[in-house]
Amino acid sequence: MSHWASWMRFVVVAVGGLALDLWSKQWAFHTLRQGGPPRVVIPHVLEFQTMLNKGALFGIGAGQTGLFLVASALALVLVVWMFSQTPRHRRLLHVALGAILAGALGNMFDRATVKLYEHPLPAGNRLVYVAPVSREGAEVLLREYPPRDGAVTFRLYPDPGRGDVYVVQRLPGGIRRRLKALPREVGFVRDFIKIPTTVPAWSWIPQKLRGRELWPWVFNVADALLVAGVGVLAIHLWRDRRPERPGSAAVGDAKTG
């Protein structure tokens, strides 16, 4: 079992990382214009651009909210168990496990609280995501996300004459559509960090690769904590399982003999 100082390192990193992740997401989504152009922080190196991601790390496995929540809960249990089995002198490993816990909790919080409705448009059955804008009694005003010029707005309300059948009125235009149930809710993760690096246009690089983004994903602090923590953990596991060199045991015996 780890020493109390080890627990302190683990908890401080986990709580501090989680607080930084949630605060940075709150700041970005209240300061930056959603759906707008990126804010350049360091040209060609760092930009801020808000985006809702329905997948896991870097958008993998989009739309599986329930599966991600269950997997995240299991991962949290595994991380705490691994920490409890870690020797007290593995300080860097304590920090890495705390970072993994912070990242998992940060994205898990978003998936459980940041929800959009998944709704097919009447014309062409095109699937869009709509966010609740306001509520008045049983009626909900929904607007297409992300915000853009010409975004579709809906009014969702129950049909009093047909029980739990819902009516969606598209605004403007008054196009109506009946639904047997509410649109499906999907959990999202808030991302806002972008590294806008591209392949340079050097002569020896193939033409089709020049100008392509090296890092097309938008991510958040939780993603960075997860990647850093898992990287350190992988290095530790690899070092612990490396086979001993043939002469190392004999040398050790000679020194102790």
Protein language model regions, located:
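Alpha-helical transmembrane bundles and membrane-interface segments of multipass inner-membrane proteins
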Residues: M1-G257
